[in-house]
Regions:
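ABC ATP-binding cassette signature C-motif
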Residues: 8-236
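Short, flexible cytosolic linker that couples an ABC transmembrane/permease module to its adjacent nucleotide-binding
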Residues: 1-9
Length: 236
């Protein structure tokens, strides 16, 4: 597959400002007191001992879920593309892959079948493959569709919640390289150690009592004694 993320436009200096974010779900406090200001070029690994906290955080940033407290303000020059952990809702209708991807186009020029097929082709859906129904897709095929959508959107901020799910090794390597080369901002959660280590220059951890926020690599974060002590304190 050819996963290449391009930006329609570059973002200005104001990327994202999060203040006092808090969320409880099913009686469990996922995180609170989350303050975060993203700078241009930040590629952020999002961590938490509770994976639900990460997913809810992404859903709030994407505007799909409301926080219990706090505010999220995106810079006016930003546009976001979100790869959710659960993409089931995207594949409810019985559409061909061409028509499925066409839903996310912005103008008549983009709606042309040739244009849409170009993005599907990058993810190895060519010829008749691009005409099959999105209802019969495997987990891996759905992920490939979601990457086609993400490439088509040409956003300058990528929100990726476990993007390596269902991907083979070759696709993971391709994704890793394209995220490393991406010129915009990234917020990323992943179980792939190498991806977090090679892509991210900043680590945030969401805890019930607040945020740990460090400008360092993932490996440095894991080895940092002060961070370790702080984690023990903030989760207790």
């Amino acid at each position: 597959p050819a996963i290449i993320f391009e930006m329609e436009r570059e973002a200005g200096d104001q990327i994202l400002d999060v203040k006092g974010l808090e969320k409880t779900k099913d009686g469990e406090l996922l995180f609170s007191n989350i303050d975060l200001n993203l700078k241009k070029g930040d590629k952020v690994a999002v961590l938490s001992k509770n994976s639900l906290a990460i997913t809810e955080f992404f859903e709030i940033l994407a505007g799909n879920v409301e926080a219990d407290k706090g505010t999220v303000a995106w810079g006016v020059t930003t546009n976001q593309s979100h790869m959710p952990l659960d993409n089931t809702n995207f594949f409810q209708e019985d559409l061909s892959l061409v028509d499925w991807l066409r839903q996310f186009t912005k103008n008549d020029e983009e709606r042309h079948e040739e244009f849409v097929r170009g993005f599907l082709g990058r993810m190895l859906f060519s010829g008749d493959e691009a005409l099959k129904s999105c209802k019969v897709l495997s987990g891996g095929e759905k992920m490939r569709c979601m990457f086609s959508r993400m490439m088509l959107q040409k956003a300058n901020v990528l929100l990726l919640d476990e993007p390596t799910n269902h991907l083979d090794l070759e696709s993971i390597t391709t994704l890793n390289n394209s995220l490393s080369n991406f010129k915009g901002n990234i917020l990323l959660s992943s179980h792939d150690h190498e991806m977090l280590s090679t892509v991210c220059n900043r680590i945030i951890e969401l805890t019930p009592t607040g945020i740990i926020d460090r400008e360092m690599t993932y490996d440095e974060y894991l080895a940092d004694k002060k961070v370790k002590e702080l984690r023990e304190k903030m989760y207790s």
